């Protein structure tokens, strides 16, 4: 078993502590992603000898793209070669309005700034397009780009499946959604970092708290709780190009440092089968 337990889930487990303690103690070994999850299970009576922290296997499956392939992604998305790009990925209702307002204000200062906006649920794309139009911001839907040329847009609405990961590869930095409004929980904060990109996220990242804390500590992540904080963080990174270049190398080291969970879990399974 490999897993993580958020504070929200832990509160539920504690209500029925005796039941979950008995349930989890049936497992031979519980491989947890972080100490917080291990300590949570121990607090409801799970035997510590059955608990082992091995890290997050997501670090072992992160994609990579060569510079040549990244250039092709940029061309495919019709993003101008000299544009600065930020991505707001896996956004939820209530987040797009804030992000678009921040982008519109920053566009006045940074004329070559492009936002790629990727709602988490594709069925929200039509609603998101209406929000963009209501704000008078020039945009194009990714699904409409197949037969269009040119770079005349401020926002690219990513309304297609399976492209967000490679889009992260061509941005300067990213905001990861489901973190700015309640109940939140956060989505995968590590995906942009795999491409050397620092990340912004809101205060509601319970599902990824351990990774969020590690990113903040390393300087690769910034938590923003208000629209003003988001704008200030984006403006800072747009203005500090040398810092972004430094963070790119740091991000790759961060990922390498956290890899190996899958191998550790495989070794544990192998030992159990032999024993």
Where are these regions (language model features)?
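Nucleotide-activated sugar donor-binding and catalytic core shared by glycosyltransferases
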Residues: 1-275
């Amino acid at each position: 078993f490999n897993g993580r337990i958020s504070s929200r889930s832990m509160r539920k487990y504690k209500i029925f502590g005796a039941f979950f303690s008995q349930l989890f103690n049936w497992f031979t070994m519980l491989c947890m992603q972080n100490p917080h999850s291990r300590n949570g299970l121990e607090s409801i009576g799970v035997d510590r000898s059955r608990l082992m922290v091995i890290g997050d296997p997501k670090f072992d499956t992160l994609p990579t793209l060569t510079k040549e392939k990244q250039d092709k992604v940029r061309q495919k998305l019709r993003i101008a070669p000299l544009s600065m790009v930020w991505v707001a990925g896996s956004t939820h209702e209530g987040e797009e309005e804030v992000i678009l307002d921040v982008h519109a204000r920053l566009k006045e200062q940074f004329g070559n700034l492009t936002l790629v906006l990727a709602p988490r649920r594709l069925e929200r794309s039509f609603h998101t397009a209406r929000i963009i139009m209501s704000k008078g911001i020039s945009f194009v839907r990714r699904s409409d780009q197949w037969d269009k040329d040119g770079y005349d847009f401020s926002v690219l609405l990513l309304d297609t499946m399976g492209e967000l990961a490679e889009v992260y590869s061509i941005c300067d930095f990213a905001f990861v959604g489901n973190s700015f409004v309640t109940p939140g929980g956060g989505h995968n904060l590590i995906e942009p970092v795999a491409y050397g990109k620092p990340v912004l996220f809101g205060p509601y990242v319970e599902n990824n708290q351990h990774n969020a804390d590690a990113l903040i500590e390393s300087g690769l992540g910034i938590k923003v709780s208000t629209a003003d904080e988001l704008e200030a963080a984006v403006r800072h990174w747009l203005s500090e190009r040398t810092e972004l270049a430094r963070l790119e190398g740091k991000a790759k080291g961060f990922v390498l440092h956290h890899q190996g969970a899958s191998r550790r879990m495989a070794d544990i399974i192998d030992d159990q089968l032999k024993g």
